[in-house]
Amino acid sequence: MQIYRRPFETKTWQYRICPAETMVKIHPDLTTSGAGEETSSPYLTTEQESFTIWMKSLVFNTNGCTVFDSKGNIIYRVDNYNSKSCREVYLMDLSGHVLFTLRRQKFGLFKTWEGYRSSSATVESTTKLEYFRVKNNVFQVPNKDSSSSYRVNAGSCRNDEQYCYKMVTRGSSLAIEDNCGKLLAEVKRKQSINGLKLGDDVLTMMVESQVDHSFIIGLVLAHSLINCIL
């Protein structure tokens, strides 16, 4: 087990112990894809990496999202065409191979999205490979200046009493942490070299080492869908 210091906490206790059996690795060399099938990931970071998220589709004048790596190469895309906040969204690579399918679910009053990792390029292969579930902790009125949190259930943490990760918004930034408060990724508005912030639809994402950035993008998309941004 490992002990991490929780940086943004005002409670009296300072440390929290994370039992290994309740945690899901963001991505080990060999990992389980929902149904216990082992598969290697080509999306694991070896060091801190930066990405640019453009909340626009490559298809002209349609809804979606495009993700670039630090060299300007397109690595992920989402094309919703004329639909916004639809019930099912596909995260694809540049070639159009489906990596994750995100589906909206109805659980009480809270908005919930589930992510299904594909074992191949076909949409049908995602039917039973549930990978994560994202929902807001409480009913929240969207406000760009407020703070809100979202719990992420994944792997062995499938019930609502446990969560493996959480997303916290602070103003216009989004932080993704494990359940011990260790930062895994952060998304904020992109700035130019001169320090000027670009448009609201251009974001920069920093992903820490040993993190599956395809999984992180899936969580960012779920957050955008919950808040009707995508």
Swiss-Prot record:
Signal sequence region: none
InterPro entries for the chain: LOR, LOR_sf, Tubby-like_C
Gene3D superfamilies reported for this sequence: LURP1-related
PANTHER family listed in its UniProt record: PROTEIN LURP-ONE-RELATED 11, PTHR31087
Function: Might be related to the phospholipid scramblase and tubby-like superfamily of membrane tethered transcription factors.
Family of the protein in this entry: Belongs to the LOR family.
Protein name: Protein LURP-one-related 11
Organism: Arabidopsis thaliana
